[in-house]
Design a protein with these regions (language model features):
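A short beta-strand-turn-helix
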Residues: 26-29
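Radical SAM enzyme core and accessory elements
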Residues: 1-13
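Conserved Radical SAM active-site core
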Residues: 3, 16-23, 35-38, 42-121
């Protein structure tokens, strides 16, 4: 049971429910193939049925960790830090990103955009979900839009979301892993017919790395 005092610090963003942190190769989207240090923050109520990290949903199962400790670990490994979840924007990201930027680190976020954007970000990957749509200014600020394709209806959703981002935003369609054999040919066909889109694959799963 987390005390009220600790929970206050979490709500302020001074501590965060840390699920895991690891140094690996970015497997998805624009920066795939590059080394980065990942910080996975617990807590998410978006509830995607195909989520591959459902253990991240309940923030109370992950230890509240000071952002100073998180930053000190991150700086040992990489100049590029990716904050993911869970849904990191559940929490105030300003204290963490201020700490990372003070050490001259590049800050990237992977988010559904379901909560207002906080933090100082060099790269924003917006991956919107139907059951809890993005809010606020994140559409204008996203550098890449990554839509997960589980069935043919997701192509319609992808176009609806693409209409809301800036012209400079890079557009990706990514197969949901469990249906990849069926859905990849559909994505390939769609991208060939609509070349503003690119294909994103979870290459880290093919490489068998985190």
């Amino acid at each position: 049971m987390i005390s009220d005092g600790i929970m206050d610090l979490v709500n302020q963003g001074v501590m965060l429910p840390l699920m895991e942190e690891f140094y690996t190769i970015q497997g998805e989207g624009y920066h795939k193939g590059t080394a980065a240090y990942f910080i996975r923050v617990g807590g998410c109520d978006v509830g995607c049925h195909w989520c591959d990290v459902k253990e991240s949903w309940n923030a109370e199962t992950h230890p509240p960790t000071s952002i100073d400790a998180i930053v000190e670990n991150a700086v040992k490994y990489s100049d590029t830090i990716v904050v993911t979840g869970g849904e990191p924007l559940t929490w105030d990201m300003n204290p963490l990103t201020q700490g990372l930027k003070a050490r001259n680190l590049q800050t990237h976020i992977e988010t559904s955009g379901a909560y207002p954007l906080t933090g100082i970000w060099d790269w924003i990957c917006l991956s919107p979900k139907k059951n809890k749509l993005p809010v606020g200014e994140i559409y204008d600020k996203a550098h890449e839009l990554k839509v997960i394709v589980y069935n043919k209806h997701d192509f319609i959703f992808a176009e609806e979301q693409a209409a809301k981002v800036s012209e400079d935003c890079i557009l990706y369609l990514q197969p949901e892993w469990s249906v990849r054999e069926k859905i990849v040919p559909q994505i390939v066909d769609y991208v060939m017919k609509h070349p503003k889109w690119k294909v994103s694959l979870q290459t880290h799963k093919y490489l068998n790395i985190p």
